[in-house]
C-alpha cells in the first residue's frame, strides 16, 4: 500500500510549480501569437503600433482585479470603449497565454516520463489515428457487444479548472484563471447564460480543449484503475495519465456510490475481453462476454459523470448493441461486421463432402453521402453529386488550380485508402477531377469537351501529373496493374494526426 501511495504522489518539485510570473513574460505571448495574432486589435482599437506590447496585458490584468463584478451598467459599452475591446482581448490573448504556460509545463513532464519509460519511439508510431483501425480488424470480429458512448460536456468551466488544479499547485495562477473565466462568461452570457461554455469553446478553442482533455483523462484514469486494478501501477508508460492527488479518496467515494445500487459491483468488473477506444468526445466500448458486464460499465460511466463531475447523463443515452446487427461511425468511417460465407470441398477416401464456413469480417466503408454534402457545401458539386466549376478560383494560374484540386484529392485518398470498398472513393475522385476540368474550362472560356481534348497535350499538366505516379493515379484513370492492385487493398498510414473532413478539403 505504501508503494502505491508513493507512486500516486506527485514529485515535490512539481508540487511547487509557480507559474503565475510567466503570465507577465512577453515571450509567452510571442509563442502563442507568432502566427495567429490579429494585429488589427492593437492598430485599430488601441492606437498602438504594429509591435506587440506586454504593457497592454499588464494593464488588462490590473483592470480585471480592480473591476467590480457586482455592478453592471447598461451603458458600460457606450461609456468605455476600451472596456468593450478588453473582452475581445481577454478571449484572444490571455487565454492563449494560459494555454501556452500549461502546455509547456505538461509537455516537459510528458517528455521526461516517456524518456524514463524508454517508449518514445513507440509513442511516436502510435500517434496516428489510423493505428486504431488495424486494432479494430484484429479484435472487433471476435467480440459480441458494443456500446457507442458520447462523452458529455461539463456544465461549468469551474469543473475543468478544478481538475487542472489537482496537477499544478499555484494559487495565484488559478485565482487569476478563475477571475478571467468569471469575467468572460459574465460578459458573454448576460442574455443566454447556458451558452457561456459553448461560446468560450468556440472563441478560445486551444485553451478550452486543453482543459477538456484533462477532464477526459480524469475519468479515464479511474476507469483504467478499475479495469486493470493494481496491475496498472507497474506500467510506467501510463503514469503521466493518472491523477495522484486525492486518488484513493475519490476511489472510496466511487465504491460507496456503487454499493448503494449494486452489491459488490467492483468484483464483477473483471472482464479480460473488454476493449475501450476513444477519439475526442466519442468512445467505443466492446466486449465478448454477456451484456450484463457491459451494463455495469454503462452505469459506472453514468454515476461517475453525475456524482463526481456534476455532469448529467441518462442511461438511455448509452445503448448496448449486438455487434453483428449494429453499424457505427468512427473517425470518418462507417464500420460494420458482416458475415462472409465460403464453401470448402473435402474428400475422405471415396466420399466427398462440402463444408460451409462462416467468417466474421469487418467492413470499413467510406461514408459517401456526408462527403458529398461537404463537397457541395464547398461548391465542388451539387447535393446530388454532380460536379461544378469553382469560379472563385478562375483568377488563379492553371498550375495553382490543379495544385489545389490535387491537394484535396490527395488528402481524401490518403485518409480513406483503408476502405474495404473503393467504389465510393473513386466517385469522389471523379467529382474532383471533373470539377477541376470545369474550372479550367470556365477560366479559358471553353467547353468541357473541347478542353478535355486539349488536356492530354498540355505540357504543364503532363509535367505536373507525372511528377508522382501516385498523384497521377488519383486524378486520371491508370492502366498499371500494380497500381490497381494497390488501390484494391487497404492501406493504413502512420502519419495522419487528424480526421476533420473540413481540414481534408481545405485548400489553404
Curated annotation (Swiss-Prot):
Cellular compartments annotated: Plastid, Chloroplast
GO CC terms of this entry: chloroplast
Signal peptide coordinates: none
GO annotation terms (biological process): mRNA processing; RNA splicing; tRNA processing
UniProt keyword terms in alphabetical order: Chloroplast, mRNA processing, Plastid, RNA-binding, tRNA processing
Superkingdom: Eukaryota
Main location: plastid
This protein's record includes keyword NAD: no
Gene Ontology molecular function terms on file: RNA binding
Coiled coil (UniProt feature): none
Role, per record: Usually encoded in the trnK tRNA gene intron. Probably assists in splicing its own and other chloroplast group II introns.
Homology family: Belongs to the intron maturase 2 family. MatK subfamily.
PANTHER family: MATURASE K
Protein's recorded name: Maturase K
Biological source species: Lotus japonicus (Lotus corniculatus var. japonicus)
